[in-house]
Amino acid sequence: MGQVLSDESSRHLSHEELTHELASRFADKCFTSLEIYSFKDVFKSLADNQGGIRYLKEDTLARFLEIPDILHVSPVVFQMVSYIGAFPFLQNAPAVLGLDQMVMVVVIMTQRHKRVLAKGATDRAKLLFKSLAVHDRTASEAAVAAEKSSKEEQATQSQPRSHVAGFAVDEPVEEPEDDDDDLEIAAFELLDINDAVWQGDAPKVQGAMIPADNFRKLLMLLILIAPLNAQERLSMYSTRVTGDELDSLRATAEHILAAFLNVEKAPGIKFSQYNRVLPVCFPNLFSGFSPLFEHFLFSKNLDFTKHKGEEPVAEKQPEEIVQPLLPEPGEILNLNVLSQLSFFLPGSDLFRRLRPLYSGNKDGFSTGSFEGKVFNWRAPTILLVRGTRIDDDPRGSQQSTFAASIPPRRFPSGSKGERLTFGVYVSTPWKHTAKETFGEGDTVLFQLEPVHDVFPASRYNSEFISFTKAPTNRPMLGVGCPHPRPSQAHRRNEMLSLGSVSLLLDDSFEYGVFNHDWTAGGGAFATSVSRKFDFQDRFEIESLEVWGCGGDEEAKSQADRWAWEHREAEARRKVNLGTGDNDADRALLEMAGLVGSGRSGGSMA
């Protein structure tokens, strides 16, 4: 849709003309002809007209995307799209959302820009930060002061890595806030114009920050839309924004927000923290925007079942039956936690593909029950454990026994919250470990509550999972812990070792400890990118769950089983007995095998 412009001729074109040229190229390369038709039809049906200019308003956008009013996030989303709509001339933001501007929004929000702007394919996260950020001098100064205070606090908590002076590269340094906007530069190169001429005074990330309250609201929306696909409407999840479900949604958003900043000390998120945390802890955070904004590419006016010349028939279509995201909620895993997991694990392995394998409160808190329920599952698994923080001084004989089995505590707690939730993703089947650990390099250790944190597997240490039992070894379940030595009579009271970043559960699944030795490092899992200090959390276990992540066969079997159960339930619901036609009723019961052949079908009295 348009020939390549030369640098000389494009200098004489206005921003509007160049934007139209880029929008045309985006539409040609990123949309099918049917999607272009649908997009124009949807825009025409939604747009307001003022002075011959057609544009979208905030309430129109929110209504079309079905964003729940209770989240109060519509102004935040509109700020984002108004900024992105000005692409690539971001100095002109906020933009009036006309047809060309909405092409920019839909292409970028659905990540289809990668088909055209290969150079800036990884720069979308930075553009989203800038679309959410504000430039407020007072707030920025407060954020800088809070960050400085946090660093000083971390410095006092952490000890030097060695008594011997190390290399300068070992010392923590402030990451520079890179202002090379690859996505915009790639767009200028596509138009064959000099980006230095056109960038002007485009907003920079230095001094910019995302207000904490705005990001909290956006997180609630992102949790809600995480399982969405392009054929689903957001209104399908309306029950998740009422009552206890809404409270759970807010709580999950708070845990995620805590990964980016301490809300008690900082008013917003700086780019350095955002850029450090996002790739490790939330690589899929914004993935839900893709199906949400793809709704602009489906027009309700397109009906391929109607023949030319026929009048539309006002017939109510049967409501589509959708398989639930979870077969049943667990004590730890609910729909909000499921979305939280999808921010760093592939959603294709989670939504409608999980199966409960083991629950401590149902199956018993013992290694034997765990083995019987989990060891035969041949696909990946997710272990989740939740507990309540215990005091430094043991209370009672059981806590004292647990405290004596691990090294003395020397680190402070990692957070203020009393309830703690940890987990591990394991791609290989579980087994007993007599001498060495098991697990692959895609094993992930993580924390979900009260601070979301992710600890990827290290490339230098493979002590991922230990599951030992007597009499060969001292019984324990360890993640990132050195494998215990074989038991001997004189060693039975020997303490268990904790890894630099590790999770250990005792043999009765009564107590656990998470250790984060940031100073030492070098363990099976990487240290935290957001909490750069040493900490340790000891807790009494309340819930322990293991979920199986179905492979293709397991997922198909689960979907078929659910569909069969739904059909059977629907068939039973539709059987209407007691209508007065006894012969018809009896015939139905005989077909079901409930009467006949000696069965009376009478009362149970």
Swiss-Prot record:
Name of the protein described by the UniProt record: Restriction of telomere capping protein 5
Function text: May be involved in a process influencing telomere capping.
Domain of life of the native organism: Eukaryota
Gene Ontology annotations for the cellular component aspect, listed alphabetically: cytoplasm; nucleus
Residues covered by region (Disordered): 145-164
TLDc domain ranges (all copies): 331-550
Keywords (A to Z) from UniProt: Cytoplasm
Family, per entry: Belongs to the RTC5 family.
SMART domains: TLDc
Biological processes per GO annotation: response to oxidative stress
Subcellular location field: Cytoplasm
